[in-house]
């Protein structure tokens, strides 16, 4: 007899969801019974790390990732990480074990009361099946919903007595289904946009994370070159959509209304592709657009298009739209922009290293196709200026700014891309939110490199304290941390690098290793 359990595993197998990220409780054990040999279970010691690892896996692989959380408490533990997954359009299929059906109403221990409401609004769809026989169909719906554009996390609560129930008749059709979705704006709209771009006196391109998510980086380069446009990365960048040493590359826009308007001044047409308009952060009011400028947004997310405070928008598949747009625009006779100058090396004067020096070492030694998982807000600008990123899928940063992303996401990304080297660059304040991911890296021998920038403070908060005129705020420093001791306690090799030479030696060693290595680097505090 085929059961809900066996039918569900067939559906997961059909969609390639054979890696399960989780931390089991009693509600989840029936799901894990007779765990298939062709599946692998990645245990995290805290659900925040579990969701973070799955997020990194989904981002780096471009495929959905499967998560199994423990009831309401485990869901709550993972929701901080879920904020990042939501804003990065990560297709996470999250399941949570529920009490047996007859015990939910009396709110027995581990009953997830009103389970469908718990993860909202951080999921695209949330559901608890009305009966056991509907579990396989609901699981199929969850996978399809997470995968269809705009991609996003979904959540399914499953009572644990459902797994042993008989599967419904016809359940085999679910595993055979294929659902595809791709939309292209109407030809007339594409022709109109192509004409506007071709006639523009001084157009500019602003690219967001969904360009990289669609693997459309090369198309963005073609468009910039054909129209001789400078290319900026949209503010609050969580991915790298454009090669950072290309002549058209201008850098990352600031996350402030006035700052964006100032840097885009002089452009008459702003084309934003694969990004919301815009992901602001610090409050710096001003004009949304420079005088005389128009804006057009191309996005895969109707919500992003609807909530933008200005400009026109086309909603469609990013890669298909860029490909079609390339056919509509005429080549420009303008000269290509001049490439940005490379920043000079900075002299070290003893004491903690400058973050810029750390990034220069990383840039010199990292493989060409390295994947950088970055979680150090105060050093973002210096990193983008000094580390070259060439290939798609080279950079991941917490899309909602939720701390605890870096270490787990680096582990997940390395699991997803075993042939590329993952280098996590994480601040000491951020690292502690996801520190248990080191145990998972050690247990599964995940050869990621973790570089901890140790400045003893929340550097970005230090900067914000100045901006907000709160110089006496408590709780901004994190002294007394020994990351080498912590890493070794979790089973990860750890090295301390206090000079440039020590860092070079440690990084060469880590890159040659077949296991995870953590490098602790005391650094100065700089402004974002």
Swiss-Prot record:
GO terms of biological process kind: mandelate catabolic process
User: What are the required cofactors?
Assistant: Ca(2+); thiamine diphosphate; Mg(2+)
Binding of Mg(2+) occurs at: 117-118
So where does Ca(2+) get bound? Answer: 428, 455, 457
Record's PROSITE patterns?
TPP_ENZYMES (PS00187)
What does the record note about the cofactor? Binds 1 Ca(2+) ion per subunit. Binds 1 thiamine pyrophosphate per subunit.
**Cystine connections:** none
Provide the GO MF annotations for this entry.
Answer: acetolactate synthase activity; benzoylformate decarboxylase activity; flavin adenine dinucleotide binding; magnesium ion binding; thiamine pyrophosphate binding
Which family does the record assign?
Answer: Belongs to the TPP enzyme family.
Tell me which NCBIfam families the record gives: PRK07092.1
Instruction: Please report the name of this protein according to its UniProt entry.
Output: Benzoylformate decarboxylase
